[in-house]
């Protein structure tokens, strides 16, 4: 079944979802509404990260949104399980990345401009409305613009047409085929590898791996042995802050990481700021094994 977006008046209906038997959709709808209501306050006060999903198909929104929230919540719960009291548990849940949905080029651009300093990643379809008409190149144009302005933000381009893979690689952006039988697993892999939900992999500028940390404890342990070139490589690309933000680690020390990253000439300040993040997490009762 295909629903024509023009059949619905957005003044009366915020968004259309399609029930396919997945009970997680109901919770995802509630979380989506909460994120839209709280994102302005949470980004301003706590620098909470934002994921923008650009999709106009109710069917795919209804399929993908529960998966996205499930990945984020599972990461947050893995941290909260070791909390000492309810206060850090509540803080961690409030500090999880927010997911915002856009169904048109103009709305996606508006969200991007508004929350650009807090972006964790962008997931976009290829074909959706632009200037009031369905544009087969809207997703390509949007991601290309975002890559030019914020080159370090991970981009995911999904489409039902395999021919778009080459165009996505030219941006560059990760490409996933909507018709893939393992689409959900591939999206989970994107979260793990590109959005900071997996291990922090230390690499040299040439791509050679020199270390790996699964949690804050391991990050603190291996930092003294990581080559300066690797630390500066990641710091200048805001990889540390992105990885920590994905885990809802929002200490005051983290606020200094962007400034350190942009003009880093020595690895010691970056090491100190990153280690301070784990010390802060330990003080508030969060698990260093997150």
Language model segments and positions:
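Acidic, metal-coordinating helix/loop segments flanking the phosphotransfer/catalytic sites
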Residues: 79-121, 129-131
């Amino acid at each position: 079944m295909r629903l024509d977006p023009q059949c619905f008046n957005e003044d009366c209906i915020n968004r259309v979802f399609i029930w396919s038997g997945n009970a997680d959709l109901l919770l995802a709808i509630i979380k989506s509404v909460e994120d839209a209501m709280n994102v302005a306050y949470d980004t301003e006060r706590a620098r909470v990260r934002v994921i923008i999903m650009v999709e106009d198909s109710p069917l795919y929104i209804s399929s993908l949104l529960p998966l996205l929230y499930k990945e984020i919540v599972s990461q947050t719960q893995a941290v909260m399980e070791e909390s000492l009291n309810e206060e850090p548990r509540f803080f961690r849940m409030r500090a999880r990345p927010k997911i915002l949905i856009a169904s048109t080029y103009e709305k996606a651009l508006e969200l991007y401009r508004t929350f650009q300093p807090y972006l964790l990643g962008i997931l976009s379809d290829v074909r959706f409305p632009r200037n009031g008409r369905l544009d087969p190149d809207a997703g390509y144009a949007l991601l290309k613009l975002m890559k030019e302005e914020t080159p370090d933000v991970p981009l995911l381009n999904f489409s039902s047409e395999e021919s778009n893979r080459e165009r996505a690689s030219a941006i560059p952006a990760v490409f996933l085929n909507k018709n893939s039988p393992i689409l959900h697993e591939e999206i989970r892999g994107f979260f793990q590898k590109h959005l900071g939900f997996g291990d922090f992999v230390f690499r040299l500028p040439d791509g050679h791996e020199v270390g790996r940390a699964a949690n804050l404890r391991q990050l603190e342990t291996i930092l003294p042995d990581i080559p300066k070139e690797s630390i500066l490589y990641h710091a200048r690309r805001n990889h540390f802050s992105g990885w920590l933000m994905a885990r809802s680690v929002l200490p005051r020390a983290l606020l200094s990481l962007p400034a350190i990253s942009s003009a880093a000439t020595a690895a010691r300040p970056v090491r100190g700021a990153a280690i301070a993040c784990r010390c802060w997490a330990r003080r508030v009762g969060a698990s260093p094994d997150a």
